[in-house]
Amino acid sequence: QWLTEEMQWSVPEGNFWDDEKLQRRLASRLDRWVSLMRMHGGAQAEMIASAPEEIRDLFSKRIKLMAPLLKAWKGALKAENAVDFSGLIHQAIVILEKGRFISPWKHILVDEFQDISPQRAALLAALRKQNSQTTLFAVGDDWQAIYRFSGAQMSLTTAFHENFGEGERCDLDTTYRFNSRIGEVANRFIQQNPGQLKKPLNSLTNGDKKAVTLLDESQLDALLDKLSGYAKPEERILILARYHHMRPASLEKAATRWPKLQIDFMTIHASKGQQADYVIIVGLQEGSDGFPAAARESIMEEALLPPVE
């Protein structure tokens, strides 16, 4: 019921737990939910009390279903004398707040600040509280915030001064990743969200021809046939989709059908920091797996993650 009604997954009849594809998909979800519970750090009653009132009853039922898995995870950590990532941060905060460690650092530098969570922000606050001379230097870009699913809270970046005090802001407004034609499309898309910081984005290179084209997804094979005629062997073709299960079936025979092409497939999330000569994005349609994302979060994410921004 949880998977079919709330998550809207298609679950095969019979012994669905033997379905390997479903096992992999469910395993990643269970791992995420346990991680969110660990990041919260509180007792079960505290988690339930902190959930929005309109979902509290359902969340209470779901978290009770997850309780044995969380208990097993804690037991495994104890048996191996190990600590997970959330546990490390919680322990560090407690040690700092109890004065068992005095921070000697005057300068704290944080990269990828847009991916910071309230838990990690609390660690920064505890470090700064230990030393009144400490300064915080952060590099982040709210336009690249992609980790809310693991607890990142974008307002810690967009409202930086409210959270960490007054300071100087410096905009790095030149991108070296793409030409101006792609930049124009990216700018229009990102700035439709009023929650994003307004800032200029200038490309180092100016595009002299059309850089973005929309095609029907049925034309993917024909497009690769065309690219096979003029793409150089060293040029990379990167095909992206929202989820792994959206990988085009024709790529199974890519090595024999398009032997001259260097084709890679990745999820959009995993492609951050990558580059390619040609990028093809599939799955740009409405629906449960499409764009924009429908409300597909489970009650666990809705209760334990920061609010959607």
Where are these regions (language model features)?
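Conserved helicase NTPase motor core
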Residues: 55-156, 174, 273
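Conserved RecA-like helicase ATPase core segment
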Residues: 118-209, 307-309
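Conserved helicase C-terminal RecA-like lobe
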Residues: 107, 233, 274-309
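Short acidic low-complexity segments
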Residues: 266-270
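A basic/glycine-biased coupling hinge at the interface between accessory DNA-binding modules
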Residues: 1-83, 103
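Generic beta-sheet signal
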Residues: 106-108, 136, 235-239, 263, ...
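Helicase P-loop NTPase motor core
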Residues: 166-169, 174-263
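Short beta-strand/turn micro-motifs composed of small residues
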Residues: 140, 241, 283
